[in-house]
């Protein structure tokens, strides 16, 4: 097995980075389309007369923010020199668990466990934003 020369390794790295960037751009376009569809859905739910539409509206808002956070994560990836900041994944995790609590709140024990998971993620976020771990 021969070792690859430095220019060849850099070329392979550049090709893979380009493929990754194009994939993320495609994903971003798909998320923007879904964000637009969710906006239309939220407008429909907002003007629906049913009582259950309030829960659908809140759930739709949280899903809207999830799309928004994923788009912001991709934007931050390109702005920060092709790396994903950890705290954006934590934000997405918190929002996803909040959505889960809103949608599935039948079991008090499950809600307590989800709340503990949110607390753990908030502590993680606090640790990531401390001076020792701050990169930005």
Curated annotation (Swiss-Prot):
GO terms for biological process: cellular response to phosphate starvation. InterPro entries: P_starv_induced_PsiE, P_starv_induced_PsiE-like. Keywords: Cell inner membrane, Cell membrane, Membrane, Transmembrane, Transmembrane helix. It is a multi-pass membrane protein. Its main location: membrane. The keyword Cell inner membrane applies. The chain crosses the membrane at residues 15-35, 55-75, 82-102, 108-128. One of its GO terms (cellular component) is plasma membrane. It is found in: Cell inner membrane. PANTHER family: PROTEIN PSIE. NCBIfam families: PRK02833.1-2 (NF002764), PRK02833.1-3 (NF002765), PRK02833.1-5 (NF002767). Belongs to the PsiE family. This is Protein PsiE. It comes from Shigella flexneri serotype 5b (strain 8401).
